[in-house]
Structure formats: structure tokens, C-alpha cells
């Protein structure tokens, strides 16, 4: 279901958004916000957060920087356990109790392998 939602958003970004004027009042844009939510949250929470964001994106709200906030629990860390590293796509910046801001790593900063 997540993949279907992500493919719908990508279709919107690639085909529909290109012909419409830029009107989003926030950074990241509402469609990019939705992609980040669906990649890092469960489908129900992502859908609610995306809907709330789209409803806030109008002239009655100031706009500005509005990163997604998700709940995330990280596994335990041990210096004796071997860790596998892959490319980092998102940074999780602490916000409140087990809540984190989601910030995407710029493509130019990603390590080329």
C-alpha cells in the first residue's frame, strides 16, 4: 500500500506538478513532505499528516519550514556488534519524547559507491 501511495505521489510530481504554477507555502513542498512521511511512517499516520499539511497549505497560514515529525524507536547499540552501513537517506533530529524531525540528506552529499 505504501508503494502505491508513493507511486501516485511520484506521478503527481513528475507529470501534474510540472504544468501547475508553484504555489506551496512550505519547505519541503507538500508532495515531498508526503514522500518523506510515507517512507518513514506507517501508512495511516502518513496519510493523516499529509492531509493535515495539504489543508494548512493556503493563504490563511504563514508557511515556512515544516519538517515531518515521526515517532521512531531505534534498536540498541553495542560496540561489540558488527554494523552494516548503507547510504543514509534521512537524518532523524530529536524533537520530543521518541519523536524526531525527518530531514532528507542532499543528493550531492551522499557518498557515491
Curated annotation (Swiss-Prot):
GO cellular component: plasma membrane
UniProt entry keywords in alphabetical sequence: Cell inner membrane, Cell membrane, Membrane
Membrane topology value: Peripheral membrane protein
Domain of life: Bacteria
Compartments it resides in: Cell inner membrane
The family this protein is said to belong to: Belongs to the UPF0161 family.
Function noted in UniProt: Could be involved in insertion of integral membrane proteins into the membrane.
Name of the protein in question: Putative membrane protein insertion efficiency factor
Amino acid at each position: 500500500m505504501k508503494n502505491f501511495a508513493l507511486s501516485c505521489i511520484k506521478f503527481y510530481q513528475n507529470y501534474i506538478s510540472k504544468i501547475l504554477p508553484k504555489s506551496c507555502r512550505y519547505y519541503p513542498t507538500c508532495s515531498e513532505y508526503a514522500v518523506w512521511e510515507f517512507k518513514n511512517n506507517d501508512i495511516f499516520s502518513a496519510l493523516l499528516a499529509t492531509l493535515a499539511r495539504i489543508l494548512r497549505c493556503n493563504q490563511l497560514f504563514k508557511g515556512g519550514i515544516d519538517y515531518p515529525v515521526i515517532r521512531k524507536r531505534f534498536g540498541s547499540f553495542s560496540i561489540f556488534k558488527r554494523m552494516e552501513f548503507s547510504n543514509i537517506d534521512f537524518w532523524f533530529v530529536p524533537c520530543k519524547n521518541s519523536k524526531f524531525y525527518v530531514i532528507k540528506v542532499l543528493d550531492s552529499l551522499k557518498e557515491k559507491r
